[in-house]
């Protein structure tokens, strides 16, 4: 009984670790997946433009890993500067309130009312300034995240451009070509593989985008990530319609 209980205790931390693994995205696993995908593309279509796009996407994924670390880590210099600025402003407000006096024989209450009104205005403006200072770090991180997400959005469109002329209907029906028709040298199997690789690249692109909100809670960045996920899902659906035509 003791041996069984001991084995259960040993398995419990391992089970908890495995459960935790599947509740969060792992940037290293995404990079490994993309490396394998790039290798498959290079081996199947050496020297192709799609292989170069996969290489660029791998570079962006590695950059995303460092960006995610930056987004998740507190920026202590910024926080210290903001804290100091807030203390200075609060000290100024305290000094202004302390100077308000009710002077007998010199207007009294009217002067006090004016002083209180001025103090309230100062408090409102200082509150706005404090809010601005407290959101500096988030806005700086958001700017970096949105810049990186814009690159991912562009890559998704580039992948879509690569599959744009890959028309299975042209391959299956073999209509006469014109002077402006794209050169088609792929077999049915190669075209299916090419389209499948494009779909996989779009899927990985959306996963890289999701990394940016894994440990960075910002609604603006989350909205941008959702847009990329919707974009890649829509583009992937178009690709799978072509793959379905090939398999009919």
Region locations from a protein language model:
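N-terminal amphipathic/basic-hydrophobic helices that include classical n-h-c signal peptides
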Residues: 1-20
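Cytosol-/stroma-facing membrane-proximal "stalk/adaptor" domains immediately downstream
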Residues: 205-248
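Solvent-exposed, non-transmembrane helices and loops of integral membrane proteins
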Residues: 47, 146-188, 244
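Alpha-helical transmembrane segments and their immediate juxtamembrane boundary regions
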Residues: 66-140
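Amphipathic alpha-helix face/heptad-repeat signature
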Residues: 26, 30, 53, 119, ...
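Mature extracytoplasmic or organellar-lumen-exposed domains after removal of signal/transit peptides
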Residues: 51-69, 96, 186, 193-212, ...
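Short, charged/polar, low-complexity loop and linker segments
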Residues: 36-41, 107, 127-136, 178-186, ...
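Short, charged cytosolic
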Residues: 22-29, 37-65
């Amino acid at each position: 009984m003791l041996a069984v209980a001991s084995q259960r205790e040993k398995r419990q931390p391992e089970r908890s670790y495995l459960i935790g693994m599947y509740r969060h995205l792992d940037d290293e696993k995404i990079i490994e997946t993309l490396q394998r995908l790039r290798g498959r593309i290079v081996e199947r279509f050496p020297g192709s433009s799609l292989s170069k796009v996969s290489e660029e996407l791998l570079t962006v994924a590695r950059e995303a890993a460092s960006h995610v670390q930056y987004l998740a880590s507190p920026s202590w210099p910024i926080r210290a500067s903001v804290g100091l600025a807030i203390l200075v402003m609060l000290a100024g407000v305290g000094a202004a309130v302390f100077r308000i006096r009710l002077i007998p024989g010199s207007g009294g209450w009217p002067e006090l009312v004016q002083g209180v009104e001025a103090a309230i205005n100062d408090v409102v403006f200082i509150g706005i300034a404090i809010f601005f200072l407290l959101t500096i770090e988030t806005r700086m991180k958001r700017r970096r995240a949105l810049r990186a997400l814009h690159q991912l959005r562009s890559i998704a469109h580039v992948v879509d451009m690569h599959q744009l002329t890959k028309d299975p209907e042209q391959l299956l029906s073999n209509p006469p070509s014109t002077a402006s028709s794209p050169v088609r040298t792929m077999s049915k199997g190669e075209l299916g593989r090419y389209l499948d690789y494009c779909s996989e690249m779009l899927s990985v692109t959306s996963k890289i985008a999701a990394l940016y909100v894994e440990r960075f809670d910002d609604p603006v960045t989350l909205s941008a990530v959702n847009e990329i996920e919707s974009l890649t899902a829509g583009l992937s659906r178009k690709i799978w319609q072509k793959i379905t035509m090939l398999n009919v």
